Amino acid sequence: MKPYNISHMIMSIGNHKKNYVMKINVVSIFIVLLALTSCVNNSTSKRNKNMDTLNLTQKWDKTFPKSDKVEHTKVTFHNRYGIALAADLYKPQNAQGRLAAIAVSGPYGAVKEQVSGRYAQTLAEYGFLTIAFDPSYYGESGGTPRNLTSPEISTEDFSAAVDYLSVRKDVDAQRIGILGICGWGGFALNAAANDPRIKATVTSTMYDMSRVNANGYFDKMTVDDRYELRKKLSEQRTEDYLAGNYERDGGVVNPVPEDAPLFVKQYHDYYKTERGYHRRSPNSNDGINKTATLAFINMPILSYIEEIRSAVLLVHGEQAHSRYFSEDAFKRLKGENKEILIIPGANHTDLYLSLIHISEP
């Protein structure tokens, strides 16, 4: 992939007293959340007694090497549904004071040991306190049934991460941003529209999961197609109820048919090989619950993105099959602090592995 530089990308983020600017220099892909208002927050978090108890793996089991530039710890927090979420926290070595913080999640069907952890660790090397979290029902996080997604709860998880970060004594609560990858890019935008505590939002290789489930790729589904899909999935609900469990969608197809679309082959090249396989990843194994699609068909997640007032950066590959999701979302954003970055020559999954290099202009 050919490097792409932005030497003078300015996002102004202000309050009633001052305006601050963020300069972003990106080689390959990424963002920086800088120079926001400082504040003091002495709150402490009280554990929710109704929260799930999690059994977290303490060994390093990521799909990427551990950095010697950051401290790594396992942490947990909970969303407002009482679901306990597991996260990897990355903090610069010898960091002092209150830091800007970023919560990272995605891709859709992935776990924190894959792409989101790679992003979070890299950002921590550049001075941020970051968490990469498993969404509800995924990986080491709580919630049943397993391998479920939800337009509401998957969005809520980002705000839950902000809850957690905002009460940490080493985080500046006025300098918290979120980063969503693939399907979690759409959830990140949805969270930003609903939660003014989020001061900047970045999406990487974004999917609008409501749109793709309701309309198919490139919006090719008809009303009749959608009816037949609803009928099939509703019948699956009956089968699941009788069986006492939930049928999975099978994850990334394996082996890949020769006539499969190129992006399916690219997914396989990541999730089903040593590049990205992880034993807790739905995509790497048996997938998401089939009936999860029903909620997305009926509940659009990007209804209010025009009302986002904080900074937004959308990053996508030039050759990605999913590029239109970012471009269409960008057209709808009304805020002054918005940018879209198209990476020349990159496909959807190139942005899963391309490390981010952030430097001063």
Region locations from a protein language model:
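Alpha/beta-hydrolase active-site loop
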Residues: 148-169
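Residue-level detector of conserved catalytic or cofactor/ligand-binding positions
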Residues: 356-361
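Conserved alpha/beta-hydrolase
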Residues: 122-140
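N-terminal cap/lid segment of alpha/beta-hydrolase-fold proteins
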Residues: 53-96
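The serine-hydrolase catalytic nucleophile loop
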Residues: 109-121, 135
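Catalytic histidine-centered segment of alpha/beta-hydrolase-like enzymes
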Residues: 346-355
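Short beta-strand/loop motif that positions the catalytic acidic residue
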Residues: 308, 314-316
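Alpha/beta-hydrolase-fold enzymes
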Residues: 189-272
